[in-house]
Amino acid sequence: MVKVSLDNVKLLVDVDKEPFFKPSSTTVGDILTKDALEFIVLLHRTFNNKRKQLLENRQVVQKKLDSGSYHLDFLPETANIRNDPTWQGPILAPGLINRSTEITGPPLRNMLINALNAPVNTYMTDFEDSASPTWNNMVYGQVNLYDAIRNQIDFDTPRKSYKLNGNVANLPTIIVRPRGWHMVEKHLYVDDEPISASIFDFGLYFYHNAKELIKLGKGPYFYLPKMEHHLEAKLWNDVFCVAQDYIGIPRGTIRATVLIETLPAAFQMEEIIYQLRQHSSGLNCGRWDYIFSTIKRLRNDPNHILPNRDQVTMTSPFMDAYVKRLINTCHRRGVHAMGGMAAQIPIKDDPAANEKAMTKVRNDKIRELTNGHDGSWVAHPALAPICNEVFINMGTPNQIYFIPENVVTAANLLETKIPNGEITTEGIVQNLDIGLQYMEAWLRGSGCVPINNLMEDAATAEVSRCQLYQWVKHGVTLKDTGEKVTPELTEKILKEQVERLSKASPLGDKNKFALAAKYFLPEIRGEKFSEFLTTLLYDEIVSTKATPTDLSKL
């Protein structure tokens, strides 16, 4: 066994040794063990320099795009990978053959139980965009998964008892989404810098649960977010190889589905599958983050200004091209092509509005099935039956055998002109309203927020922020008033929205709308542009102590 030193490793939180969710006896101390810390410290020390280099490369690309010296295209240096028809992904893994309906949500204990009890095939437990990364959310997410995998997650609240509907081996397959490469976990420092949040989330889950999941016959499986280059996928593959070797399980046991949710990654889909080869379980269309990334990377180009967010749909030219290329790529390489999120939630007090929303979900899933997707996402258990009803028409567990004939060019992926697209005052109001509501909830520790009958995550607020930055930067003209979008206009409407939302808040003066607005304002005035809202806001939810925990007592 490799000897790992914990010298210069600082854990800046107390480790709770008391069980929180009785009757389970699992504590945070059972997760943050000395041997688990040694494992994640080894991964961090081995791979963190490469992680930082790859993040710097993103900014190199951005500078080239901004200068006009480079346009996104398929990489000439990897043409041999794209042009070689002989390589394939691995044989489908147990528990991942039928993925027609996947449910997603943060690793809160009650939501985890509800998701595992839902009529779905797989469950993406999310440490990323639908979770606010407070220490408790992240570490108790690990506790909850540890207990679920061992059939000891049942618990009671004063209002309700939560119980699994049977043995977890017979329930939906768990797929964990760790935080992206750009994020860090500031409650644990290694060699004077915060540990990679990706390695923290992946490492703790894998170390404690990989062998238990193998016994169950399904896992360990992951979703990988926010990648922008195939070398970022190679980095994950290297992490997987070291992790599997370390605990003594065969390479290829891990499987990972990559979310194609950044514009640069859309030009490298085949390379991403290739880099993960023995660990690949396909690609997924992360629609809202993809829109966010498209605006972000093309934000300084006046030829790529998107209209009001409700006019950017999956049938918009650049979105349709990305979906078609993803399905064709995945099926040629023998892996799953997963559809995107239906964010709707039931509207209990308005049957007519609810029926309209559910019809929209059904039509969206029919479009995905017809295009060739092998399954799709839902945000709420009530939507699972709709997705099931649509995808049962495949007649098989997946439709990887179906390779749609289409040719998608680089120009197609960059076709952001939307016929009859408009930018209006209502578009500004909507972006500010949704962005503020999401950021305020996130600052209070909630990353999965119902807004206007949709279950929203961080991608929603990111689209709001990017659109407003872009509209101000390019001084677009509003269709309804003929007024130019200026920093003064967006600031004025922001103040109006903060006042309205603060007055309506059930928290009274304990709401965090003013704090959210403080961070939002420079972005929507076009004065600065942060890579991610979550990293911009993160320090507000970090709660460290001055004296590190004595690791010898773990």
UniProtKB/Swiss-Prot annotation:
The GO terms describing molecular function are: malate synthase activity
> Which pathway or pathways does this protein act in?
Carbohydrate metabolism; glyoxylate cycle; (S)-malate from isocitrate: step 2/2
Q: From the UniProt record, list the reaction(s) this protein catalyses.
A: glyoxylate + acetyl-CoA + H2O = (S)-malate + CoA + H(+)
Per UniProt, the enzyme's principal EC class comes to transferase
Catalytic center residues: R177 (proton acceptor), D457 (proton donor)
What the entry lists under Gene3D superfamilies is as follows: Malate synthase, domain 3 (3.20.20.360), Malate synthase, domain III (1.20.1220.12)
Quaternary structure note: Interacts with PEX9.
Q: Per the similarity annotation, which family is this?
A: Belongs to the malate synthase family.
Q: What does this protein do?
A: Malate synthase which takes part in the glyoxylate cycle. MLS1 activity is essential for cells to grow on oleic acid as a sole carbon source. Two steps of the glyoxylate cycle take place in the cytosol, the splitting of isocitrate into succinate and glyoxylate, and the dehydrogenation of malate to oxaloacetate. However, the formation of malate from glyoxylate and acetyl-CoA undertaken MLS1, occurs in the peroxisomes when cells are grown on oleic acid.
Protein name per UniProt:
Malate synthase 1
> What is the species of this protein?
Saccharomyces cerevisiae (strain YJM789)
Lineage of the source organism? Answer: Eukaryota, Fungi, Dikarya, Ascomycota, Saccharomycotina
